């Protein structure tokens, strides 16, 4: 496995490679990331993974505790990626990605990036889209792999490549869950044992809605919100039923008769967790 820390080294490493699959990450890797690599490995001659904690997608452009406290464990991440079968790792620092300071020209995500997660984290998806566009330009992948846990991110990136005619196929990969049902996330490392137990109310509420839909029962969305809002140690950010492609909220009156996605975010202590489930 080759590790490149500069753009030139990355471009040199990619010379003469055939089909390329890209797995963009911010590090602090877990089994969910390994599933992305597995999917990429099955469809491409060469698999590239990036590790970069992107300040543009954090509050105050990284001048915040969330950015400073984001887990960084490069040696462990490299070991996981090598075992998973990655060929090239791109692990730049901030100066390498944004030489001379933050960029003047950004990718702006419009309405799809300002609702739900974007409403709570202004500018977040502009930062995501900007760094992903840079990675696409550097790696020139045939396919790129993103976890379905970040459903809004997947929708934003799909619009990015469609609207800017970037020739890359976006491959969402299903959510990986721990045995207790919690969606795998790098942020889970910041939960205490008690906080992790409190966080389980999120997948429980989502799976409850899915069971009601499967049984042909009416969905009580406000009841689901109330359950999360009143759970011990939990603060509700949002829970909505949306169109899977556009993320536009769906108005339902009783039974749901069309494909839909429930997206939700909560805080457990200082840790923000997101999850979603298909209905």
From Swiss-Prot:
Record has Cytoplasm as a keyword: yes
Main location: cytoplasm
Amino acids binding ATP: 26-33, 147-150, 176, 184-187
GO BP, one annotated term: pantothenate biosynthetic process
Chain sites annotated for binding beta-alanine: 57
Catalytic reaction annotation: (R)-pantoate + beta-alanine + ATP = (R)-pantothenate + AMP + diphosphate + H(+)
Active-site feature positions: 33 (proton donor)
UniProt entry tagged with the keyword Hydrolase: no
Record-level Gene Ontology MF annotations: ATP binding; pantoate-beta-alanine ligase activity
Known EC number: 6.3.2.1
Subcellular location: Cytoplasm
Pfam families per record: Pantoate_ligase
Superkingdom in the source lineage: Bacteria
Quaternary structure and partners: Homodimer.
Additional detail: The reaction proceeds by a bi uni uni bi ping pong mechanism.
Family note: Belongs to the pantothenate synthetase family.
Record-given protein name: Pantothenate synthetase
Encoding gene, per UniProt annotation: panC
């Amino acid at each position: 496995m080759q590790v490149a820390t500069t753009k030139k080294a990355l471009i040199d490493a990619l010379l003469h490679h055939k089909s390329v699959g890209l797995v963009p990450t911010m590090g602090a890797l877990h089994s969910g990331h390994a599933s992305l690599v597995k999917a990429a490995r099955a469809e491409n001659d060469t698999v590239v993974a990036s590790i970069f904690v992107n300040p543009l997608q954090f509050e105050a452009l990284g001048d915040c505790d969330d950015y400073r406290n984001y887990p960084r464990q490069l040696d462990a991440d490299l070991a996981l990626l090598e075992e998973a079968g990655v060929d090239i790792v791109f692990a730049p620092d901030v100066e390498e990605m944004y030489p001379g300071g933050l960029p003047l020209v950004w990718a702006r995500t419009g309405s799809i990036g300002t609702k739900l997660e974007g409403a709570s984290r202004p500018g977040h998806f502009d930062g995501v889209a900007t760094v992903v566009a840079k990675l696409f330009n550097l790696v020139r992948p045939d396919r790129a792999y993103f976890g379905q846990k970040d459903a809004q991110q997947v929708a934003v990136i799909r619009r990015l490549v469609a609207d800017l005619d970037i020739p890359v196929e976006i491959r969402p990969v299903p959510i990986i869950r721990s045995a207790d049902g919690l969606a795998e996330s790098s942020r889970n490392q910041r939960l205490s044992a008690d906080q992790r137990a409190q966080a389980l109310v999120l997948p429980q509420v989502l799976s409850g809605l899915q069971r009601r839909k499967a049984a042909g029962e009416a969905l009580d969305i406000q009841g689901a919100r109330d359950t999360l809002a009143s759970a011990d140690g939990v603060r509700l950010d949002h829970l909505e039923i949306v169109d899977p492609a556009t993320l536009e909220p769906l108005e339902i009156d009783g039974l749901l008769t069309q494909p839909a996605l429930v997206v939700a975010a909560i805080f457990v202590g200082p840790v923000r967790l997101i999850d979603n489930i298909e209905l």
